[in-house]
Curated annotation (Swiss-Prot):
EC number: 2.1.2.10
Binding site for substrate: 232, 261, 399
N6-succinyllysine found at: 368
Organism: Mus musculus
Record's protein name: Aminomethyltransferase, mitochondrial
Amino acid sequence: MHRIVSVVAPLGFRLQAQPLVQSRPLSSVQDVLRRTPLYDFHLAHGGKMVAFAGWSLPVQYRDSHVDSHLHTRRHCSLFDVSHMLQTKIFGCDRVKLLESVVVGDIAELRPNQGTLSLFTNEAGGILDDLIVSNTSEGHLYVVSNAGCRDKDLALMQDKVKEFQNRGLDVGLEVVENALLALQGPTATQVLQAGVTDDMKKLPFMTSAVMEVFGVSGCRVTRCGYTGEDGVEISVPATGAVHLATTLLKNPEVKLAGLAARDSLRLEAGLCLYGNDIDEHTTPVEGSLSWTLGKRRRIAMDFPGAKIIVPQLKGEVQRRRVGLICEGAPVRAHSPILNTEGTVIGTVTSGCPSPSLKKNVAMGYVPFKYSRPGTQLLVEVRRKQQMTVVSKMPFVPTNYYTLK
């Protein structure tokens, strides 16, 4: 989901910044960048800061990108994702408001249950992806992408004004908390030491407000962007450094930056907004049909429904697929060809997989080439390499569900 810089590098590696989602070392832009509450904390721990989406964020720390990636898969890592836009939608008509701009069935969410959903336009394109939680405190808690902050806020604020002008009860508030992601197989074991709530009773895509290592008012959501078990903690900004410092005292926990986050999400088959999905991609083309609520499909009452719903019943022209590639690492914008050498699509994300020690990628191909096992070619530095369409995720996910 979350839009991050595409800065993964070959195994063994020299870190490279990819130009599609801009990130650059801090220089003259430093003074105009926003800083998270953990900025000084990152510097003190060797964070290599880059400019991303108007923020100064760590791309990695003293450990290599690959070390951080593998540590997350085997133990757990702490990511600062405070640049994400956090909002509350409240009022009696809050569900009706959000359902006017997203494709999901928000009304069916139980108290403190969440889901991934999509903002769409009337042409069926994806404006952004978001996580929405139906809190037991009487509001919807929404987390969306930093790179889409302005357009997401404008979309929601315009809808609030429209609904209020119609006499409906809605409101919107930006949450100025920090947001920390603790990800990996031992993440909740680490967290359990600092909370009184039983983490075994908090399954994937549910949340609760609790005190975490002495910091009150934290919303803990069992979700993440790595494919591993883990949580995202919305923490009051004044408590962010204390919480991060306390978590880091546990030997299971290491800091990780944008580079590891990108390769982890790609192994998990998760989309990067702006690369893998955008305003010209429909949920069906993006292999995200599961985000469309069944009730919403029948009612056809979400933006772009007249375009999107018919695609569910027939073949779309193109489809997002996974690719396992031979040869050199494959990057975004690399052409995809059929075995006759005709260009049929484009890679949208790619990197060497530290877990698999293979090159993995995502891209779009015509529907007839989207079946797993289909042999194709990719072009890297003007040379053609064999690739095969693969099921995703590339690495099995480990989300926690109640037995």
